[in-house]
Amino acid sequence: MLSFAVLLGATVGCSSNPLAGAPRTIEPAAAAVSPPASQSPAGAVRPLPAHAAAAVFDAGTRRLAVLAPGSAPAAPGSLTVFGDAQAPPRVVDLPGPANALTDDGQGTAYLAARGGYFAVDLSTGHTAQVSVTDAAQTEFTAVARRADGRLVLGSADGAVYTLASPKPGAVSAASVASRNKVFARVDCLATQGDTTVVLDRGQTSVTTIDADGHVQQALRAGRGATTMAADALGRVLVADTRGGQLLVYGVDPLILRQAYPVPQAPYGLAGSRALAWVSQTVSNIVIGYDLSTGIPVEKVRYPTVQQPNSLAFDEASDTLYVVSGSGAGVQVIDHAAGRR
């Protein structure tokens, strides 16, 4: 891992200068195709026939937002917003296809799209389409929000854009503060403070970008990393789906702190103060691990809906949401961490 970090650090800088030639890649890993659920899912299941692609829980409005693609690659996607358990969810039709989802914790969701992003008010459903300067033909595939409010977007052609405005929901066009094109593809972004972590599935790597937009360290991430999530304690969780591991990183500097076997094609991730949550897509199981001792310790496990690709967690109520990627609904597990 060290040799990879040194090599990448020596060949990239803080501007948009690309590497000489395309980065070497492997076949990206993916979630397993889950069998039908063999056990009744824990908790309650709310219907959602769409094949969900991502989910976030917004603490400010106490709403769960679930992104689903359209019926065809070019068809507009939708955002389903779950609030009151006694009321039907709100379905927000998006202006176009969307590829990734994040939120600001204060009631606004941001979705990566072609040429820019969508900003959705989770309380009203109002949606704004924001274009990124000089990126009209760019397919944005990942999005995250920094602590200073700035959005970071990743693209299908391997670039990371840090936007200039600290209020991304209040602009109609977004200028770019920095751009780094050093990846094969940007599949996932996460942030800790104003540091951005980039996951490239084809390179099965994680890379940090600092607050000024400078590329910092890079490390290999197992044999086939697929998903990534940040937690409230400064850690970044990565699912090595092909290698069957949970990887836990610190970001300042980037360092692999824990690697623990998780079989059955781990994929869905959610961080929390108490436990790190990982879903197993082969077996339709979600597991909560305590990371506090330095070696992950399994504390709880629950049977899930089929294809548990997306997880979200509500710290205030200790509620875990497991969102099916096959149309089997949204599973709600109250008091998920239990007594510890």
Region spans (language model):
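Sec-dependent N-terminal signal peptides
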Residues: 1-6
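Predominantly soluble domains enriched in secretory-pathway, periplasmic, or organellar proteins
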Residues: 8-10, 14-340
